[in-house]
Amino acid sequence: MIRRHLLPRLLPLLPALLAGWPALALAQPVPPRPVLSRPAPGPVRIVAGPGGGCIAGAVELPAEGVGYRTIRMSRSHFWGHPSTVTALQILGARARAAGLPTLYMNDLSRPRGGPMSVHASHQTGLDADVSLDLSPKYPLTPAQRDALDPPGLVAPDRRGVDPARWRPQHVALLRLATGLPGLDRVLVNPAIKRQLCLDATGDRGWLRLIRPWYGHAAHMHLHFRCPADQPECRDQPPPPPGEGCDASLQWWFDQLDVPPPPPAPPRVPPPLPPFCQALLGVQR
């Protein structure tokens, strides 16, 4: 029993004494997050488009759910419109039902949207990156999940997929993605689109929504249409008709033989809408 007159001397030492006992250690106060690291309060409001907008009232994708888990969590890029979060949860559940491995969810948007250093879009809560790594998944520590960098599927010459990594299940996953509610398009590397054109059987209408774009060798980029209740949101033109397995796809590979142009001057993005500037403050 500790004598009462000794307690004042022992209290400052308690955190060190209990450090090896997680259940007993004194909880350290967590400082409040800066305002801009939290979503703006109030109803959901999307302003402008994915390359120059913002979102108020965003919700966060849970770190784990049926058929998925998030990675690189310290970036806090898992915020989006409620319909985007629901669609990703649907994708995880459908992937699980189809017998696919757990999916890794990567970036959505910042808590209030707006520009991101690693993306040109992802600004309005309507974009999400989903890893194409379909290897078996195992428990990871938080540090491992934060540092995870799944491998790409494209061969070094960029003209096709890596046969050691490409699987029939990739066709199934990408087809599942095109059936999500509100989906506008899925961006993948041109080599992945080319392989889908070769492998897809039966009804191939879903290929129209798979669009080739630079990069995107290790993940698919899901872009969702503006929700009907967001009049200030700006949609992109819809994908052109057809499967997209024609000369328009071949163009991407023809460019591999063209010498790269001289570096262009840095592009200065247009100013954000006034609402977004006020919402984001110093983020802009």
Regions found by a protein language model. Give the residues of each.
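Short, surface-exposed glycine/acidic/tryptophan-bearing loops
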Residues: 117-135
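Active-site acidic/histidine clusters and adjacent loop/turn architecture
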Residues: 40-106, 166-175, 183
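Catalytic cores and adjacent binding grooves of peptidoglycan-active enzymes
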Residues: 30, 140-284
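Bacterial N-terminal signal peptides that target proteins for export
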Residues: 2-14
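Extracytoplasmic
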Residues: 98-100, 123-127, 217-219
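N-terminal signal peptide c-region/cleavage motif recognized by signal peptidases
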Residues: 20-22
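Extended, low-complexity, intrinsically disordered C-terminal regulatory tails
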Residues: 33-36, 87-118, 187-209
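Boundary at the C-terminal end of the N-terminal hydrophobic targeting segment
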Residues: 25-29
